[in-house]
């Protein structure tokens, strides 16, 4: 609630829309309506109920906002099995990057939030901002995020408990790690990063939350250009706490989107087989590959006869014939994706790896 009050006080002249749990839709923003909703939300929290709230520069949910403060909370006592992590997101205009004062203001928000909350993980940086109802815009987010690796796809971040309850999603301009995650990184790794890449800074709050920043301005991570080494080095260093096989990032099944396979590729987009301990081998010629993966579906057929095993949940390896449907096997209830099968043995003796592609 304090975050919402602070955001409203600083940016009220930009705010036009408001959505709290009792509204079920966006309504016109006013200071009076905001105070009324905040009072009701306080009572909601006291009843040990989750809270969803948004204040936005957009009056309606049809457009992407320049300013937005959004949360979906857990219950205060954490009694609900599927709602044990709270989500908080703040949006600011991209034009802030051009203004040194605004960039400092942005960093003040990062420091404030990390000092106020026992953060598990998070990030601050570039994002493809979508309207409140993002499903139809997922193909757009996919196109942007697969071309610019440092622009975060975030339309389903509110559901992070499904995927990221024990690991981080990715690195970013600012990468935020709670104490439980940052302690899993060996001290010598932090020391090596500081020596090799002085533009990577680490600031740790009194509560143990660490903020790792790369450069004064974010690199977009253009996939058509050589990727910045400092991002690749940080990715390598934090790989032990980044989710290796996450859920799918998108809901869609038809248009280009982040299905389970493409989500795996995205998670490993910064990986470089020619980098070791933050140092790129200039003579390295190893081609980046990924395992052969197939997400199950009604029309999906086995592409190669051989031994396949579930990759995104526990399951037994089975032999499957080429052209046959994949079997239906039990999977976790909170897994948005279908079973992601990995080929671990081929009848024809062929390769078990592919060069990852977002096309």
What is each stretch, according to the model?
Residues 70-74, 285-295:
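Short, flexible domain-boundary/linker segments around small modular repeats
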Residues 38-64, 180-185, 189-204, 306-309:
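Amphipathic, interaction-prone secondary-structure segments
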Residues 289-359:
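Compact beta-sheet-dominated domain cores in extracellular/mature segments
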Residues 1-14, 132-289:
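C-terminal interaction module
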Residues 71-72, 78, 199-204, 318:
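Short, exposed beta-strand/loop patches in secreted or surface proteins that constitute
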């Amino acid at each position: 609630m304090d975050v919402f009050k602070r955001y409203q006080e600083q940016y009220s002249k930009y705010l036009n829309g408001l959505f709290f749990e009792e509204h079920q839709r966006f309504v016109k923003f006013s200071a009076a309506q905001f105070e009324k909703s905040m009072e009701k939300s306080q009572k909601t929290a006291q009843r040990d109920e989750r809270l969803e709230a948004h204040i936005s520069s957009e009056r309606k949910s049809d457009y992407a906002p320049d300013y937005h403060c959004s949360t979906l909370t857990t219950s205060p006592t954490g009694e609900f099995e599927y709602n044990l992590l709270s989500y908080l997101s703040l949006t600011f205009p991209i034009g802030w990057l051009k203004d040194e004062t605004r960039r400092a203001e942005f960093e003040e928000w990062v420091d404030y939030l990390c000092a106020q909350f026992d953060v598990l993980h998070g990030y601050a940086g570039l994002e493809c901002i979508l309207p409140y109802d993002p499903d139809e815009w997922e193909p757009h987010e996919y196109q942007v995020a697969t071309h610019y690796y440092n622009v975060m796809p975030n339309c389903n971040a509110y559901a992070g408990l499904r995927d990221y309850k024990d690991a981080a999603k990715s690195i970013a301009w600012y990468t935020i790690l709670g104490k439980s995650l940052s302690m899993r990184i060996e001290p010598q790794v932090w020391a090596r990063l500081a020596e090799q890449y002085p533009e990577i800074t680490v600031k740790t709050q009194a509560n143990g939350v660490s903020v790792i920043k790369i450069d004064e301005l974010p690199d977009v991570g253009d996939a058509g250009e050589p990727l910045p080494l400092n991002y690749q080095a940080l990715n390598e260093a934090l790989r032990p706490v980044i989710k290796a096989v996450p859920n799918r990032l998108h809901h869609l099944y038809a248009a280009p989107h982040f299905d389970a396979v493409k989500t795996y590729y995205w998670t490993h987009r910064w990986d470089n087989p020619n980098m070791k301990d933050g140092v790129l081998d200039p003579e390295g010629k190893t081609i980046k590959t990924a395992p052969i993966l197939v997400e199950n579906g009604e029309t999906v057929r086995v592409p190669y006869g051989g031994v396949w095993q579930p990759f995104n949940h526990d399951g037994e390896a089975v032999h499957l014939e080429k052209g046959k449907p994949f079997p239906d096997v039990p999977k976790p209830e909170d897994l948005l994706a279908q079973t992601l099968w990995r080929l671990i043995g081929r009848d024809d003796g062929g390769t078990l790896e592919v060069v990852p592609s977002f096309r």
